[in-house]
């Protein structure tokens, strides 16, 4: 059975969950790990992130799209090409909040950048819940679209949420993904802040072949 939650809610189960925040937290997590970060530790609050500052630890994230004062990096995935051997502490408006609400047997991070790597990982599991992070408590088109792309490739029983997301992807999958993302409300807000290049970057499919898996309090690369 595959379920898709359009907005985050407390999830506690002995199955597999996938968190999706295309713009931009899970895209940033995937990019950081693909470029050699030791791990990505999601935290809820800015103060909590700052407490963890130390050598070889980067304090990263955003509030209202903007890097907080004193942080090393924002939430733009294109800032994470030079994080080899660093521990990344990440706090964001939507993605890390969604992550904090999930308690599951396994938790993976997905976006378009690692789409088929996640799909292949999920073929080994019978029960999957995909949690869309949304944007400020509202449904985010790009997250539901990505969830639908995952569901589309998996032959299993579907909840109504999974069926809706799959149908959205079926109607959209032959269209220009970058153009689709730019039309989303969240993308338009990011573009106003000057992050158009992030939207273009996050619309790439299968740029990376890694799957972040949550272990204890952090995301690491899933072992091959």
UniProtKB/Swiss-Prot annotation:
**One Pfam family of this chain:** 2-ph_phosp
> What family is it from?
Belongs to the ComB family.
GO MF terms here are: 2-phosphosulfolactate phosphatase activity; magnesium ion binding; sulfopyruvate decarboxylase activity
List required co-factors: Mg(2+)
Organism classification: Bacteria, Thermotogati, Thermotogota, Thermotogae, Thermotogales
Q: Which reaction does it catalyse?
A: (2R)-O-phospho-3-sulfolactate + H2O = (2R)-3-sulfolactate + phosphate
Q: What is this protein called?
A: Probable 2-phosphosulfolactate phosphatase
Give the record's keywords alphabetically: Hydrolase, Magnesium
What InterPro entries does its record include?
A: ComB-like, ComB-like_sf
Q: In the Enzyme Commission scheme, what number(s) does this protein have?
A: 3.1.3.71
Keyword Transport on entry? no
């Amino acid at each position: 059975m595959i379920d898709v939650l359009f907005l985050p809610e407390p999830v506690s189960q002995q199955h597999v969950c996938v968190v999706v925040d295309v713009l931009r937290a899970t895209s940033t997590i995937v990019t950081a790990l693909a470029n050699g970060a030791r791990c990505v530790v999601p935290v809820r609050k800015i103060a909590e992130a700052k407490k963890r500052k130390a050598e070889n630890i980067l304090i990263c994230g955003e509030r209202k799209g903007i890097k907080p004062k004193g942080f090393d990096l924002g939430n733009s995935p294109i800032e994470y090409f030079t994080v080899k051997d660093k521990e990344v502490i990440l706090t964001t408006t939507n993605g890390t909040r969604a992550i904090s609400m999930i308690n599951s047997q396994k938790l993976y991070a997905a976006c378009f950048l690692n789409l088929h790597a996640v799909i292949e990982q999920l073929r080994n599991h019978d029960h999957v819940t995909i949690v869309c992070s949304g944007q400020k408590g509202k449904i985010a088109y790009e997250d539901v679209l990505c969830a639908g792309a995952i569901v589309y490739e998996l032959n299993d029983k579907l909840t109504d949420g999974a069926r809706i997301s799959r149908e959205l992807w079926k109607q959209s999958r032959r269209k220009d993904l970058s153009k689709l993302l730019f039309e989303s409300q969240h993308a338009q807000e990011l573009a106003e802040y000057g992050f158009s290049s992030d939207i273009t970057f996050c619309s790439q499919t299968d740029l990376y072949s890694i799957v972040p898996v949550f272990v204890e309090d952090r995301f690491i690369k899933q072992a091959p």
